[in-house]
């Protein structure tokens, strides 16, 4: 994903990976109940590995080619997306399921990096700007 351009500071130009799980509403409701205590479905959940990125900026080499990397990719965590809710929201919003998938993926990815719109208006604004930037890049692909 070319969104890496937007996250160089957080990732220090390092390779990263994440797990993506696509489920139906019933499975999403169960995951949401077990992990967050909310007995309802939702569109996307993120489960970061609680990794502190700040030491990476000190130890990882910058701008090295992939064959020169000394470290394995950083495992960021897992994103879970409900396909049922994705389809409903795409129809309600009036855009394609592909666009809604990208929107949810980017939203989940930002949560893995520590962005959180629930921490207040300022954080919500910052996260929304990052989402919009990344979605512009994805729409250009």
Swiss-Prot record:
It holds the Pfam family YbeY. Binds 1 zinc ion. The keyword Cytoplasm applies. Its cofactor is Zn(2+). GO terms for cellular component: cytoplasm. It comes from the Bacteria. It is found in: Cytoplasm. InterPro entries: MetalPrtase_cat_dom_sf_prd, YbeY, YbeY_CS. It is an enzyme of class 3 (hydrolase). GO terms for biological process: rRNA processing. One of its GO terms (molecular function) is zinc ion binding. Zn(2+) binds at residues 107, 111, 117. Keywords: Cytoplasm, Endonuclease, Hydrolase, Metal-binding, Nuclease, Ribosome biogenesis, rRNA processing, Zinc. Its EC number is 3.1.-.-. Belongs to the endoribonuclease YbeY family. Single strand-specific metallo-endoribonuclease involved in late-stage 70S ribosome quality control and in maturation of the 3' terminus of the 16S rRNA. This is Endoribonuclease YbeY. It comes from Leptospira interrogans serogroup Icterohaemorrhagiae serovar Lai (strain 56601).
């Amino acid at each position: 994903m070319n969104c890496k351009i937007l996250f160089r500071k957080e990732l220090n130009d390092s390779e990263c990976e994440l797990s993506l799980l696509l489920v139906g509403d019933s499975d999403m409701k169960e995951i949401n109940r077990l992990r967050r205590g909310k007995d309802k479905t939702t569109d996307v959940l993120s489960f970061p590995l609680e990794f502190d990125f700040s030491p990476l900026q000190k130890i990882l080499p910058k701008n090295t080619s992939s064959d020169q990397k000394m470290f394995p990719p950083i495992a960021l965590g897992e994103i879970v997306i409900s396909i049922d809710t994705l389809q409903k929201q795409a129809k309600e919003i009036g855009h394609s399921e592909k666009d809604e998938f990208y929107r949810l993926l980017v939203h989940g990815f930002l949560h893995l990096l520590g962005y959180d719109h629930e921490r207040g208006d300022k954080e919500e604004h910052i996260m929304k700007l990052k989402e919009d930037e990344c979605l512009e890049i994805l729409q250009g692909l």
